[in-house]
Amino acid sequence: MKLNRWTLAIAGTLAMTAATAQAAPPVKLAFITDMSGVYSSVDGPGGVAAINMAIHDFGGKVLGRKIELLTFDHQNKADLAAAKAKEFFSQDGADMLIAGTNSATALAMEPVANAYKRPFMVVGAGASTIVGKQCTPYTDMYAYNTTALARGTGKAIVDKGGKTWYFLTADYAFGKSLESDAAKVVEANGGKVLGQVYAPLASSDFSSYLLQAQASKAQVLGLANAGGDAVNSIKQATQFGITKTMKLAGLLLFVTDIHSIGLPSAQGLYLTTPWYWNQSPQAHAWSERFYKEMHVMPTFVQAGDYSATMTYLKAVKAAGTTDGAKVMAELHKMKVNDMFMQGGYLAPNGLMVHDMYLAQVKTPAQSKSEWDLYDLVQKIPGPDAFGPIADYGCPLAR
């Protein structure tokens, strides 16, 4: 049997197309967070589950290429996080990086992502420096930052009469950034900071720090910490009777923290959050899916992991490539409307601007179910929550 040249040409083209499709490398997403330490309940395995939910919901492929997820436990060590980020980019071919909890690790990874020109989506870390003097054209600080936390909770408590403050601060980048931002808000609204004490990350005994705070005779104890540190400091403040003379201000609290502390101890606390599992029908439906897999309601960081992943994949699809600069250009064009935020946009300094919420922890009598823990008492428009972009000091925003 003879084959004419057109048949041979078509056969050759089909063979080449099949070979190309077979050889197309996967799109690789990297995720580095605390998987086993003090912040693991905030992000950790639940963050992995949320990202995998997004990959599944997107169809498992983008640009005809399979989507793969690389994960790593940074153990809250900045040098380990930076080294693994470099390895993910240089050896494993990661196309982007999602930074989980711990600002010191995010600050260490940010210049690595910039050097490799890969999108760096910061979800769990909150230090405003990330989009300040250290900003890069590849950063997308997605969920929150210390400025927004301070402007929400700090102002609300000063407005309600909490004029004198003492800070119990986690002794690393995030805690110091949160304390600094909160102190500025307190003083700008007519309050006064009487002092601060620094506790190492993952402390178990806060008694000496709490007694120092009580001795200051401040009206408010500002907790510039998070995760297990926030839980332990609030529980111990209640046990030692600190709450009889001082009002607690949890500057970063998660739904899992309140669940762990319990409403009898946490009731009445104000907190600022970008998201709550029951804030909308869309958020509720997604959270129920997450709950079926993880058996806890998601934190805002885990919800942010899902949203950031979906947003990145949409940008890749729109750009028609995984090239970092082109994907970032698409991210800067996008308005994000999903179960996590409405009308979110990426500012020139790499900050995702969106609404935040002032919440108050319910009393046991007000709560109707195990995870019915907050009332959202005020929506804070994004520009008000995050403040003027020029104030961050990012050279890209001049």
Question: Can you name each region flagged by the protein language model?
Answer:
Residues 1-2, 18:
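Short terminal targeting/anchoring segments and short Lys/Arg-rich nucleic-acid-contact patches
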Residues 2-10, 23-398:
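Extracytosolic ligand-binding ectodomains
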Residues 9-18:
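Bacterial N-terminal signal peptides
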